[in-house]
A protein has these predicted regions:
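Membrane-water interface at transmembrane helix exits
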Residues: 35, 51, 113-121, 158, ...
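Aromatic-anchored segments of alpha-helical transmembrane domains
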Residues: 30-33, 107-114, 177-187
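Hydrophobic alpha-helical transmembrane segments
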Residues: 73-94, 149-154, 161
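Alpha-helical transmembrane segments of multi-pass membrane proteins, especially transporters
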Residues: 52, 101-106, 171, 200-201
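Structural signal for the C-terminal ends of transmembrane alpha-helices
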Residues: 2-7, 87-96, 157-164, 210-216
């Protein structure tokens, strides 16, 4: 009988050093400080000027693209994307540990943006000045959740879906372009400041770096051991085909 865990190779990720924890905390603190500093400067200044400068470059095609990105990478859309990839890994490719690694890593990067939103509580850009194309209000401008998820998705693809150095390099380049496009779409729509999307890239990275040593040193070894023991139990209880 085929071993049930043969399609579920261990998913210990790169960068397992515990030193990543203080590094991630420092990066998080720096990112939050950036947000608080930008908030203290008010809505006027270079941050708003860049948003306003994009108004003249709007076109039906770019507006359609930015609107699609806004919908697809909304909180509900993010959950669908995350669930789809995890189910694909776990059920179709029979890699449950990879599914858990991907889902938890992306979630760590994405949800870390909520820490910034709560602490900074920055008001959205004035829609009248940016001529915002969608309605966004409230004190949750810093950082951008859309951009944070895009960055976290790239981290997940590089660390879990790619396997060789070349694959990771190519995935990183393509993913970097993707994250920048999502970030620019938030500015194009007039619902975020440039510092918001920059902070998203930083705080998402901080969340991923915080999670990696926890996954590699505490969680993955235990899950791998449970999976192997469970697979052996099923294998040993299978009837002998010669009986």
């Amino acid at each position: 009988m085929k071993h049930l865990t043969s399609g579920s190779p261990t998913r210990r990720l790169p960068w397992r050093s515990w030193w990543l924890l203080p590094v991630s905390v420092i990066l998080l603190a720096l990112t939050v400080s950036l947000g608080l500093l930008a908030k203290s400067a008010g809505s006027s200044g270079p941050d708003l000027d860049l948003d306003v400068s994009l108004i003249k470059d709007r076109s039906p095609a770019l507006t359609a693209l930015a609107t699609i990105i806004n919908t697809v990478f909304s909180p509900a859309g993010n959950l669908v994307i995350l669930a789809f990839v995890c189910l694909l890994l776990a059920v179709v490719l029979r890699r449950p540990l990879a599914a858990l690694a991907f889902g938890s890593t992306v979630a760590a990067g994405w949800l870390s943006s909520e820490i910034g939103k709560i602490i900074v509580a920055r008001q959205r850009p004035p829609g009248a000045m940016t001529q915002a194309l969608i309605v966004e209000s409230g004190h949750d401008s810093f950082p951008s959740g859309h951009t944070a998820f895009a960055a976290a998705l790239v981290w997940g693809a590089v660390l879990i879906l790619a396997h060789t150095r070349i694959q990771r390099a190519v995935t990183g380049v393509i993913g970097g372009v993707f994250a920048v496009v999502v970030a620019l779409s938030r500015l194009y729509l007039g619902v975020h400041y440039p510092s918001d999307v920059a902070g998203s890239l930083l705080i998402s990275t901080a969340g991923v770096l915080f999670w990696l040593p926890l996954w590699n040193n505490l969680i993955e070894p235990r899950l791998d051991r449970i999976t192997r023991v469970g697979g052996k139990s099923v294998h040993s209880s299978a009837p002998d085909p010669e009986e």
